[in-house]
Structures are given as C-alpha cells and as structure tokens.
A protein has these predicted regions:
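N-terminal beta1-alpha1 cap of cysteine-dependent amidohydrolase-like domains
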Residues: 1-77, 81
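Glycine/Thr-rich phosphate-binding loops of Rossmann-like dinucleotide-binding domains
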Residues: 13, 35, 88-89, 121-122, ...
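Short glycine-rich anion-binding loops that position phosphate/pyrophosphate groups of nucleotides
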Residues: 33, 83-86, 117, 158
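Glycine/threonine-rich flexible loop motifs
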Residues: 85-94
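Class I SAM-dependent methyltransferase SAM-binding "motif I" and its flanking Rossmann-like core
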Residues: 97-159
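Conserved anion/nucleotide-ligand pocket segment
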Residues: 144-149, 153-191, 197
Length: 200
C-alpha cells in the first residue's frame, strides 16, 4: 500500500512528482462540495496538469458505483481533495467506495489524501470534529475511518486559520497517536513504514 497524505497538495505535490508525471489520476473533489472556500481544489488541478497527469474527476456522492469502479481500476493514482472529513467518509461508506478503494490500494496503487483525504485514513475521524463540523445528514452510526494507518493525521497544524483548533486537538487528544503536519509537509507511507517529508 502506498499513501501520500498532506494538508495542502498544491504546496507539496511536487515532492512526489515521479509518482504523478504522465499517470492516470482519479480526482475526487467530493469532500469539498459543501465547503465555502474551495481554492485548493483548483490549485490541485493546476499542479496535476503541470506534472502531465491525465486527470478524470468524479464525485462519489452522485456517480454510479460501476463508473467509480471502472475509473478506480483504470487509474494509477487515486486523489481525494480536502473539505469535510465526515461528509467524505459518509459518502465512501454509503456507496461502498471505501471497500473499492482498499481493493485498489492492495494492488499497489497510490492514494493521495489532502486534509480531509488524509484524516479519513485513520481508524476513527472523531478527533477532528472540532475542525470539521459533522453534517446534519451524516448517516453513519459511528465515526470509523478507513483504518489504513495506525495514527491520526492532524493537517494545517499551527497554520491560519486553524492555529487554535489544531493546538486544542493536540491537547485534548494527547492519548492518540497524532501526527501533526503543516501545509508544507507530507507523509509518505509505504511497505517500509512512514516518514514526514517537507517542501523547502
């Protein structure tokens, strides 16, 4: 399994450009759909284009399962934008895309998760509720994440406008194995373990 988890993809994506150049990317903006600010989605698109990736966008909350399946099977890289972690996780579980994703990752494909896309990889996403409001129509009975990693990514650490809330989460969830990253850091996870890399 290969993962690249970050706070702000367009700031750090070039660190893994060899994994992206001329590759087929399934681009999933679903987490951002209900957000007021979505500038990060456009900047991610631009970086993928600059790196020569062949990008296909798909919204898992509205697209047919068979379409998602064929796109995931065809893709080299599966990318999740930032946005609301609870909305994204709800849609992944509701549609069965969570299991589809795990199947493709088992084949060695790369998943890139930005902010919400990184948070959902943890065993649970309950720790992020102070940063991400749970939607009123959230349909899951628990806050389970994808459980792809054994730690909890805390994106935008000490970065405006999340400085106070990230400090608060670090204090309140000190018993969790939190991994705080700022907007110029990313976490590479592969068969050998995980490491934080940084854009100068």
């Amino acid at each position: 399994m290969k993962l690249f988890l970050c706070s702000h993809f367009s700031s750090v994506g070039s660190l893994i450009k060899e994994e992206i150049e001329n590759k087929k990317v399934a681009f999933i903006p679903t987490a951002s759909l209900r957000e007021g600010y979505t500038g990060y989605v456009g900047s991610a698109r631009k970086l993928f284009k600059k790196l020569g990736a062949i990008v296909t966008e798909i919204d898992i909350s509205t697209e047919a399962y068979s379409t998602i399946q064929s796109l995931f099977e065809d893709a080299d890289v599966i990318y999740f934008t930032g946005g609301n972690s609870f909305f994204l996780m709800d849609q992944l579980r509701k549609t069965g895309t969570d299991e589809l994703l795990k199947k493709e990752l088992e084949k060695g494909k790369l998943m890139i998760g930005e902010s919400a896309g990184a948070i959902i990889c943890a065993p649970t996403i309950q720790y992020i509720e102070q940063m991400d409001e749970k939607p009123e129509d959230y349909s899951q009975e628990d806050d389970a994440g994808l459980d792809l990693i054994d730690f909890y990514v805390l994106p935008h650490y000490l970065t405006a406008p999340f400085k106070k809330v990230t400090e608060k989460i670090m204090t309140e969830f000190s018993d969790l194995n939190l991994c705080p990253i700022n907007n110029r850091q990313g976490i590479v996870i592969d068969g050998e373990g995980s490491k934080v890399i940084c854009k100068d």
